[in-house]
Curated annotation (Swiss-Prot):
It is found in: Cell inner membrane. It catalyses: Na(+)(in) + 2 H(+)(out) = Na(+)(out) + 2 H(+)(in). The chain crosses the membrane at residues 9-29, 36-56, 59-79, 95-115, 123-143, 154-174, 177-197, 213-235, 259-279, 293-313, 329-349, 364-384. This is Na(+)/H(+) antiporter NhaA. Keywords: Antiport, Cell inner membrane, Cell membrane, Ion transport, Membrane, Sodium, Sodium transport, Transmembrane, Transmembrane helix, Transport. One of its GO terms (molecular function) is sodium:proton antiporter activity. It comes from the Bacteria.
Length: 391
């Protein structure tokens, strides 16, 4: 299990650095004479037709609805593995990161709502600052190397996974469109088939992938966000088999992880982080939408994660990660304010590009809040991790 975690952490760290590069590249291109190529590429229509079935979307939505379904498939696999046979399998190991994750979602949402409470249209973005980008946050923490204890990295990873689970629930409950009963029934039928395959001991991944693709199409047409099909599929992939040497879930997780870390997430960041800075003023950054997001990420995450961690420890519900101090917990709490890809994704649901006046503003708030959370979080964690000099 430790070697699995080490591989996961190293992969997430490298992915975080690649995400930064992708976002910076998008910002540079979209604020240069080549900006027309950037917007033109994302608006390229892509259509798939099989008989009477026709799915036509611009490239941006194929990335957000299609490729990100694979990202959520990976999240679902990680959550199932952790719950069945990992750090979420024992209640004593879950209490502290789960409590911190709840605080890290509730406080930013309340801050955003308070700042935008007089604008019903803007309030729709309340969930944007509740997200944490696990790849980016772990990537920043990785820069400190062995100065931070492994237990602190495990705490951040577990917290972020629970945070992702919360984001999945939020998307399902609050960001679904008009529902189609026929498509939902077909999606339910696909789920029944997947569950039956699991119970009957089917271990080949091929059949799961075929039914999963059909499930994705049904969910896409149902009005529920298509990425949730990835989560549903993940929960049906068997972790254990009669032959203890094989695990379909681990095999799929290992196969997906490099693609998600090095291709899908950087591509998503490139497609969604290209904010045009033309005509921006100080007032643009102090608008309630970007202000609510940035303050929610930077201040809300810090107060929520650190505050509820402190409360859980003081009430003796849980203990601090072994070898970690309060200064390091504060640093990690600030790092949780790196919303980036997850916040961009929720923002694309709350304020659809091209159909909402806040579509660009939310990205300004996300990038600003995430940047300062990364810089300040790194500095605080580094200072708290200094070893006293001898002599």
């Amino acid at each position: 299990m430790r070697s699995l975690f080490t591989r996961f952490f190293q992969l997430e760290a490298a992915s975080g650095l690649l995400l930064i590069a992708a976002a910076v590249l998008a910002l540079i291109i979209n604020n240069s004479p080549l900006s027309y190529l950037y917007s033109g590429l994302l608006d390229v229509p892509v259509a798939v037709q099989i008989g009477a079935l026709n799915i036509a979307k611009p490239l941006l939505l194929w990335i957000n609805d299609g490729l990100m379904a694979l990202f959520f498939l990976l999240i679902g696999l990680e959550v199932k593995r952790e719950v069945v046979d990992g750090h979420l399998s024992k209640p004593s190991q879950v209490i502290l990161p789960a409590t911190a994750a709840v605080g890290g979602m509730v406080v930013p949402a309340l801050i955003y709502w308070f700042i935008n409470r007089d604008n019903p249209a803007a309030v729709a973005g309340w969930a944007i600052p509740t997200a944490t980008d696990i790849a980016f946050a772990l990537g920043v923490l990785a820069l400190l190397g062995k100065r931070v204890p492994v237990s602190l990295k495990l705490f951040l990873m577990t917290l972020a996974i629970i945070d992702d689970l919360g984001a999945i629930i939020v998307i399902a409950l609050f960001y679904s469109g008009t529902l189609s009963s026929v498509s939902l029934l077909l999606a339910a039928a696909c789920l029944v088939v997947l569950i039956a395959m699991n119970r009957l001991g089917v271990v080949k991944l091929g059949p799961y992938m075929v039914i999963g693709l059909i499930l994705w199409v049904c969910v896409l047409k149902s009005g529920v966000h298509a990425t949730l099909a990835g989560v549903a599929l993940a929960l049906c992939i068997p972790l254990r088999t009669r032959n203890a040497e094989t695990s379909p879930l681990l095999a799929l997780e290992h196969a997906l992880h490099p693609w998600v870390a090095y291709a899908i997430l950087p591509l998503f960041a490139f497609a969604n982080a290209g904010v045009s800075l033309a005509g921006m003023t100080v007032e643009s950054f102090t608008h309630p939408v970007p202000m609510g997001i940035a303050v929610g990420l930077l201040l809300g995450k810090t107060v929520g994660v650190f505050g509820l961690t402190w409360l859980a420890v003081k009430l003796r519900l849980a203990a601090l990660p072994a070898g970690a101090g309060w200064g390091q917990i504060l640093g990690v709490a600030i790092l949780c304010g790196i919303g980036f890809t997850m916040s961009l994704f929720v923002g694309s649901l709350a304020f659809s590009p091209g159909s909402s006046e806040y579509a660009g503003m939310d990205r300004m708030g996300i990038l600003t809040g995430s940047f300062f959370a990364a810089v300040i979080g790194y500095a605080v964690t580094a200072m708290a991790s200094r070893k006293p000099r001898v002599g």
